Amino acid sequence: MIPSREIKKKAREAGVPVSTVEKDYAQNWLLKNLSSINMALKGGTGIRKVYMENYRFSDDLDFTLLEDIEAEEIKTKFKEAVLGSREESGISFSEDFGFNENENGFEIDVYFQITQRGPNRTRIKIDLTKYGNEKILLPLKMKSVIHPYGDNLSAQIKVYSLEEIVAEKIRSFFQRTRPRDLYDVYFLWDKVNTIIVKEILPDKFKFKNVKLNLEDLTKRKEDFENAWINSLKHQLKELPEFDVVFTEAVERIKNEIQF
């Protein structure tokens, strides 16, 4: 395990809490040991972990299962991954983890300690979407995990393409209120092949029976704004102005996305 001074130095440089860097570091070891499960990483964590080293930090790990896997097998593989991560990294991962199955998939809570003392533990929330509950439209990538820390970690994982990640982020605008989705689309739009994003969006919306309702989205502006700072301030040093991000995201959808 890397020394606590390295974690604290990284936190100062990134302008985020120590707990954010600890979680980022621990997530990498879990990713390495979860690669035995046939699933693909997606969402904001996928952006930081394999595409852009200095992208915003992410709290959770989100995956889509690529085959039917029973709950008991997932529990077994997660226990193996937690124990393997603990042995290889020296991080104090708890052998006990939370596990819940729902209609969409599985929710797992993994706990660990690095600099904390006493009973306090940091949680990593992991969501697995069941096979068939999401439609992957573009070829998956096999990418190396970016590990900007002083110990030795080498791992390759399956991950969504950036275009598919952005398409799901846009769809998410119309499903729930998550400021990180606004930030990601705002930041990534000029860095992906938007032609491909626009080609797959209709199928993405149709699969989840989501409507492209701009009027409803603009009505929820205040909800996004109220959650903006608390949702993102611990994930990056400089948070852009909410009005700039929201206005630009809505304008891009209005002007460039039609179906």
What residue ranges belong to the model's regions?
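Active-site glycine-centered loops adjacent to acidic/histidine catalytic or metal-binding residues
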Residues: 44
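Structured mid-to-C-terminal alpha-helical surface segments
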Residues: 1-40, 49-61, 66-259
